[in-house]
């Protein structure tokens, strides 16, 4: 028993050391990568600033050198041309050397960054191997999000979602059947309307639509005058205002409901009747 307890204690300590070691290593590598990224971004702005300063001071020194040459040699043109060429050449040489120096340091930083990223990726791969991440993640993904949905959906879904899944499969089967029948002998309008009614019911979250059932929340809109059946549905508990496109008969259930409420209320006595009672 004591040996088992000792193994358990050593195992827990090893796990803690394992996590601490990888956390420290990955944190250090990530910090170095971040510092190099920041240095690379700053170096470009520093180079631009140095280039602009070098251009400004180089032009200023060139003007001073030409002025001194003009004053010393009394405007002798060959000396002025040589001085200008030397100053401009020196300026170009310094700018080229600065660019090369920046490229040298920048390439070194890029190589360090690539090396650190490779070490970081290698550490992660080693961590995955030691923790069996690839095997466990595939199992977790299968049973949490349902990789094999046809098998796992029947296990994980409750009865209501399972019933909805069966309804959708039935609609899919009926659609394939209707397609075959329409190619052979054509599809009747009544059958297509019934199938679309079922689709509306499933998408609305209810069962099959039945305008004659008192339990259905939906009812098909039918004109009471000419008995024209529309392809529209309404909520049975909500009043509507509808004008039939065939006979122009108007259905105003809002007004009918207000009239019914007023009829149920007791009639208020007039002012003369109140005075007589007094």
Curated annotation (Swiss-Prot):
Coiled-coil portions: 107-183
Cytoplasmic topological intervals: 1-45, 99-278
Keyword Glycosyltransferase: no
Zinc finger residue extent: C4-type: 223-247
Record carries keyword Transcription regulation: no
Database matches in PANTHER family: ENDOPLASMIC RETICULUM JUNCTION FORMATION PROTEIN LUNAPARK
UniProt protein name: Endoplasmic reticulum junction formation protein lunapark
């Amino acid at each position: 028993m004591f040996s088992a307890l000792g193994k358990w204690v050593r195992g827990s300590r090893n796990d803690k050391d394992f996590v601490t070691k990888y956390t420290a290593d990955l944190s250090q590598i990530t910090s170095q990568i971040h510092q190099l990224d920041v240095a690379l971004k700053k170096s470009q702005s520093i180079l631009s600033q140095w280039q602009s300063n070098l251009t400004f001071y180089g032009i200023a020194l060139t003007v001073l050198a030409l002025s001194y040459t003009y004053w010393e040699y009394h405007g002798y043109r060959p000396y002025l041309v040589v001085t200008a060429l030397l100053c401009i050449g020196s300026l170009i040489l310094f700018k080229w050397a600065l660019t090369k120096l920046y490229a040298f340091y920048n390439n070194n930083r890029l190589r360090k960054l690539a090396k650190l990223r490779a070490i970081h990726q290698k550490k992660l791969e080693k961590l995955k191997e030691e923790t069996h991440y690839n095997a466990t993640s595939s199992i977790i993904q299968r049973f949490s999000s349902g990789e094999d949905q046809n098998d796992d959906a029947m296990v994980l879904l409750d009865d209501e979602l399972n019933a909805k899944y069966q309804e959708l499969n039935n609609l899919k089967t009926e659609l394939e059947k209707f397609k075959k029948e329409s190619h052979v002998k054509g599809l009747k309008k009544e059958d297509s309307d019934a199938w679309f009614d079922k689709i509306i019911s499933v998408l609305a979250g209810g069962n099959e639509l039945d305008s004659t059932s008192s339990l259905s929340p939906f009812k098909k809109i039918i004109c009471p005058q000419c008995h024209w059946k529309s392809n529209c549905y309404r909520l049975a508990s909500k009043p509507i205002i509808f004008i039939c496109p065939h006979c122009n008969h108007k259905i105003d259930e809002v007004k009918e409901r207000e009239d019914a409420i007023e009829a149920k209320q007791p009639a208020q006595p007039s002012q003369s009747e109140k005075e007589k009672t007094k």
